[in-house]
Amino acid sequence: MKREYHHPHHPTCSTSPTGKGKMWDADPQQDAGMDELLAVLGYNVKASDMAEVAQKLEQLEEVIVNAQEDGLSHLASETVHYNPSDLSNWLGSMLSEFNPTPNCALDNPFLPPISPLDYTNCSTQPKQEPSIFDSPSLDYDLKAIPGKALYSHIEQPPQQPPAPPLYQRDNKRLKPTTSATANSVSSVIGGWGVPTESARPVVLVDSQETGIRLVHTLMACAEAVQQENLKLAEALVKQIGFLAVSQAGAMRKVATYFAEGLARRIYRLYPDKPLDSSFSDILQMHFYETCPYLKFAHFTANQAILEAFEGKKRVHVIDFSMKQGMQWPALMQALALRPGGPPSFRLTGIGPPSTDNTDHLHEVGWKLAQLAETIHVEFEYRGFVANSLADLDASMLELRDGESVAVNSVFELHSLLARPGGIERVLSAVKDMKPDIVTIVEQEANHNGPVFLDRFTESLHYYSTLFDSLEGCGVSPVNTQDKLMSEVYLGQQICNVVACEGPERVERHETLAQWRARLGSAGFDPVNLGSNAFKQASMLLALFAGGDGYRVEENNGCLMLGWHTRPLIATSAWQLANKPALPSSTPASN
């Protein structure tokens, strides 16, 4: 068939196999009229366009079949076709939905200008274009992409050079298909021209390419938010949702949570105050079951505490992160097997008040007391309710002479950074407790900087890696609920980092280097975690499904757990600066 392009001032020619042009009269009445049968059904289709409509129907059928085979079948349910009676354009828009782009509306004032395409010289092999990525295989490992790469030219005058392409087109997959009606015409699918010869290429969704555009749009939206360009940010956050649906696995989930955080910040629909602590504890339990991060945190902290308690007859653990008490059965069993018999074990569990008037901390202590009786460990427990760790004072904890004290905190101290002077008060109270060991586990990330865009970029990389590790855990269908609830657990953190400010932003994670500086200035010295902890942590990961992707790393006496090359959590141990050094095993080495 032939496709005619009509210009109001110049005669138009249609591309033909012989390359000859055909002159057309400017009078539209001389063109073929509307097809009467389709007109009765409400569709305005010229008889001369029937072949083109048939071709688009064939293309749409082939794209749907191929997309279903790839597991990528989708249509944007929110798309509005303003004139569905225009059957040709309607089919074209449906085809474009299978390959969504941020610039789907070419006249969108919020997006950068698109370089004009040369349809006269186009070929099935698009020319190579520069990419800001340093590797063609992304594996969804996000790179630092400045938001300016997308819309830095939006405010520029029209005479400025067009913005560079947002993604490489050389990765687009083409599947040749034959058709009896496929003549030598130019088909425009997915926004760029492809000449059809005897075989007509059909553009399929390229998840990697769309993923690149998705990252660009996320970064651009975050920069628009920082610049308080809310009109642009609103347009971009809608595009994020449109692009995310074409992604599979971790990328789609991460983008969805970040889009929610951005939307809440744009529309000022801030998340409700932190959920009931018991529900948050349940989410963390699912996270504990799904992946090894909390297991690693508990194991490495327990190992440091066990070594500090060596030879002590009366020991006292003060736990800033009691939750469900999952950390302590393993330590109690290790103490029960200690040569010479177990010590007298006292545990003070600190937690927030419950909103349902239940004594949650008492229930946890009762279960631990039952275990202690079973393994013949003398056990004493006290649950201590506190609205904030910053409200603690050493005198409240009934410290006793002759006790060896250990203070433990897992994912708790970073929230104190939202309260001015909070972390300083807690560290001062810890010093007054005169502990033999302080164990701290925190996220290895910097989500507490003053610049929103920097926090957004860092958190996007961090949580993308975390979600990738969840996908790589090899979770069985039986544990699907654990995985889903773990994603909710991480999604709440994302929303807090992105949407909230001031005291409501409590997910203020900092790096190990930052914690080292803070604890050093507060009067604490680091205690090396020995090679025994390193080896046993590595063995723990070897037993965990999907453990091939996890890596234990020693960092100046501290232990880190990460996914592939990215550290995600860090365990460190500390003692008072004026205390003699604790005996330690050989420093870890990997």
Swiss-Prot record:
Residues 363-395 are annotated as: Leucine repeat II (LRII). GO terms for biological process: gibberellic acid mediated signaling pathway. Probable transcriptional regulator that acts as a repressor of the gibberellin (GA) signaling pathway. Probably acts by participating in large multiprotein complexes that repress transcription of GA-inducible genes. Upon GA application, it is degraded by the proteasome, allowing the GA signaling pathway. The gene is GAI1. Phosphorylated. Ubiquitinated. Upon GA application it is ubiquitinated, leading to its subsequent degradation. Its main location: nucleus. A motif (DELLA motif) lies at residues 35-39. The lineage of its organism: Eukaryota, Viridiplantae, Streptophyta, Embryophyta, Tracheophyta. Residues 205-575 form the GRAS domain. Belongs to the GRAS family. DELLA subfamily. PANTHER family: OSJNBA0084A10.13 PROTEIN-RELATED. The DELLA motif is required for its GA-induced degradation. It comes from Vitis vinifera. Disulfide bonds: none annotated. The keyword Transcription regulation applies. Residues 212-266 are annotated as: Leucine repeat I (LRI). This is DELLA protein GAI1.
